[in-house]
C-alpha cells in the first residue's frame, strides 16, 4: 500500500465518520496553488476544515503531530481563500484533525477526531 492509497483510506474513513454524525461534505481534496485541504464540511452554522493524517506506525509520532504550525498556517490561508471565493454563509469556522493508525494490512487500529485542533 503506497502513501496515496493510505491517505485515501484515511479520507474515506473520515468521510464515513462525518456523514454518520450529520456533517455535510462540501469539498474533498480542495486544491489551490497554495496547497490542499483534505475535507471541508458543514454542520449547522459551522464551516469545518479537516486535515486527515493516516500512518501505518508510530515511528514518526502520532499522525496529528504532522500538522505543525507551518501546515496549520497554510490550511488557515487556504480557508481564507475558500471563504473569499465561495462566499459561504457560516457564523463559525473550525479546524479539526482526524488522526488514524493502520495495521500493516490496512485495517484501522486506532483513530482520534480532534475538534478545534488549531
UniProtKB/Swiss-Prot annotation:
One of its GO terms (molecular function) is nucleic acid binding. Pfam families: UPF0102. Belongs to the UPF0102 family. This is UPF0102 protein DICTH_1420.
Amino acid at each position: 500500500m503506497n502513501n496515496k492509497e493510505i491517505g485515501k483510506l484515511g479520507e474515506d474513513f473520515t468521510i464515513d465518520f462525518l456523514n454518520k454524525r450529520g456533517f455535510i461534505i462540501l469539498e474533498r481534496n480542495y486544491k489551490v496553488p497554495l496547497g490542499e485541504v483534505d475535507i471541508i464540511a458543514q454542520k449547522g452554522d459551522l464551516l469545518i476544515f479537516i486535515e486527515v493524517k493516516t500512518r501505518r506506525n508510530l515511528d514518526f509520532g502520532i499522525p496529528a503531530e504532522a500538522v505543525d504550525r507551518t501546515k496549520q498556517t497554510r490550511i488557515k490561508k487556504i480557508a481564507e481563500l475558500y471563504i473569499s471565493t465561495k462566499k459561504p454563509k457560516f457564523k463559525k469556522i473550525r479546524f479539526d484533525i482526524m488522526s488514524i493508525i493502520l495495521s500493516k494490512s490496512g485495517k484501522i487500529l486506532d483513530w482520534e477526531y480532534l475538534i478545534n485542533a488549531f
